[in-house]
Curated annotation (Swiss-Prot):
It comes from Lemna minor. Keywords: Chloroplast, Membrane, Photosynthesis, Plastid, Thylakoid, Transmembrane, Transmembrane helix. One of its GO terms (cellular component) is photosystem I. GO terms for biological process: photosynthesis. This is Photosystem I assembly protein Ycf4. Seems to be required for the assembly of the photosystem I complex.
Length: 184
């Protein structure tokens, strides 16, 4: 969802609360929980789940390895759920022509630098740059070239925009900021 008027353009950025992240966090949690239960049932010698009889899996070495994979998977799953809970990477890009300020805001991990804010003058924006990498994994990223800051990505690398959508977005933003477009 974006909001735009004559003087202000606000573009909201979706963070880690995407359907694919929910899907992978659930799959990883359930899979690692299954590994941990099978490893634990082989250690106890009792069937905690009826799918695998505990007599078929000996604790040393299969049970230990499955328990290790289960614990490691639970740690990775908890990391994914934490990023979803904190909505890491979400935020907004605000371009204010009236005040001449560009503000890029993102949420990070909890701590001292939870709020990531970049503010600079609109006159420092030199150009809008479109990077296209063709091949097996096509990647199209929109950058903003800022004097003294370097290039700042405006789109995520996992956003699968068509070439037409990317060109449209770059043209609209360059027109709004009154800067040229560069492509490479």
């Amino acid at each position: 969802m974006n909001w735009r008027s004559e003087h202000i353009w606000i573009e909201f950025i979706t963070g880690s609360r995407k359907t694919s992240n929910f899907f992978w966090a659930c799959i990883l949690f359930l899979g690692s929980l299954g590994f941990l239960v099978v490893g634990t049932s082989s250690y106890l010698g009792r069937n905690l789940i009826s799918v695998f009889p505990s007599q078929q899996i000996s604790f040393f070495p299969q049970g230990i390895v499955m328990s290790f994979y289960g614990i490691a998977g639970l740690f990775i799953s908890s990391y994914l759920w934490s990023t979803i809970l904190w909505n890491v990477g979400s935020g907004y890009d605000r371009f204010d022509r009236k005040e001449g300020i560009v503000c890029i805001f993102r949420w990070g991990f909890p701590g001292k630098n939870r709020r990531i804010v970049l503010r600079f003058l609109m006159s420092d924006v030199q150009s809008i740059r479109v990077e296209v990498k063709e091949g097996l994994y096509t990647r199209r990223v929109l950058y903003m070239e800022v004097r003294g800051q370097g290039t700042i990505p405006l789109t995520r690398t996992d956003e699968n925009l068509t070439p037409r959508e990317m060109e449209q977005k770059a043209a609209e933003l360059a027109y709004f900021l009154r800067v040229p477009i560069e492509g490479f």
